[in-house]
Amino acid sequence: MAQLPASMRRKRAAITSIHDKPPTRKQKLANAGGWVLLVIAFVVLAVGIYGLYKVITDATVAKLEVVGSTSSVETQQVMQHVAPIIKANYFTSDLEQIRDKTLEISWVDRVVVSRAWPNGIRVRVMPRHAIARWGTGRLLSDGGDVFSEAEPTIHPELPLLHGPVSQSKMMMRRYNEINQLFHPANLRLKELYLTERMTWFMQFDSGLRIIVDQDQTMNKLQRLSHLAQSDLKPVWSKISAIDLRYRNGLSIQWKNATPPKIVNGQFVVTIDDTSIAGGTKAKP
């Protein structure tokens, strides 16, 4: 069997002797110091985690703060409504649950809930904006939602709408469309009613009353708006009420209960023996 050269055998023996050499005292101390530092780091980490756990679990119940409300009554109502579910602290409070609970309040449109250091929950509410009164004691928002105020207030400046709550959004659209139709005639809705049978009753700020059924409602109103600026313009101020529940016509009720005369196909109303339609004297 072949043997390695003497020089290679001596080199291999030297390498083996180096690896088999026991560690020095300095090396032992260095290794021990590393383990001590590792244990200390672990202890510090454990103490920190435990301390954080105690801070979270022992913190007092979060303090509720309400912003965005327009009155102290609204603020108090939000706090009373939400307070029963505020049982956790700053860290553990369920913000989504608080938001959903706040949205149950009728007059609240939107809600943003956030944490307020050091131990508060901030509830920012955005109240609904009313564009009309709805029935008795309620309001209609610009989003078409029927709601109640925190503190009921009379709003005589707002128009009155009344109908099935399920139709509130549709009624809001109709309200805006009708106002646009009759704007050229300087009319604006004061009251708008919708019955269960979908019949519309409306009264304008001039006192004019109109009734129309669900059959081609907007087409009939559009034709009337055109007549108000053309054929009916001379007598428009003399009309008390108009019934549009006819397929191809309408019924007019006059303020003085006496309809104006028709001369040459035109309405003629006499005021002090002077006609206002055609510029001629009215015939007796």
Curated annotation (Swiss-Prot):
Q: Which residues form the POTRA domain?
A: 59-128
PROSITE patterns in UniProt: POTRA
Q: State the Gene3D superfamilies in the record.
A: Cell division protein FtsQ/DivIB (3.40.50.11690), membrane protein fhac (3.10.20.310)
Q: What is its main location?
A: membrane
| Topological region Cytoplasmic | 1-31
Entries under HAMAP family matching the protein: FtsQ_subfam (MF_00911)
Which segments sit on the Periplasmic face?
53-284
The membrane topology noted for this protein in its Swiss-Prot or TrEMBL record is: Single-pass type II membrane protein
Output a single Gene Ontology CC term carried by this record: cell division site
* Keyword Transcription on entry: no
- Protein role: Essential cell division protein. May link together the upstream cell division proteins, which are predominantly cytoplasmic, with the downstream cell division proteins, which are predominantly periplasmic. May control correct divisome assembly.
Q: What is this protein called?
A: Cell division protein FtsQ
Which PANTHER family did the record assign?
CELL DIVISION PROTEIN FTSQ
In the UniProt record, what gene is named as encoding this protein? ftsQ
Keyword set, alphabetical order:
Cell cycle, Cell division, Cell inner membrane, Cell membrane, Membrane, Transmembrane, Transmembrane helix
| Location of this chain's protein in the cell | Cell inner membrane
Kindly list the biological process annotations in GO that this record carries. cell septum assembly; FtsZ-dependent cytokinesis
**Subunit composition?**
Part of a complex composed of FtsB, FtsL and FtsQ.
The UniProt family comment states: Belongs to the FtsQ/DivIB family. FtsQ subfamily.
The UniProt transmembrane annotation reads 32-52
The record ties this protein, via Pfam families, to: FtsQ_DivIB_C, POTRA_1
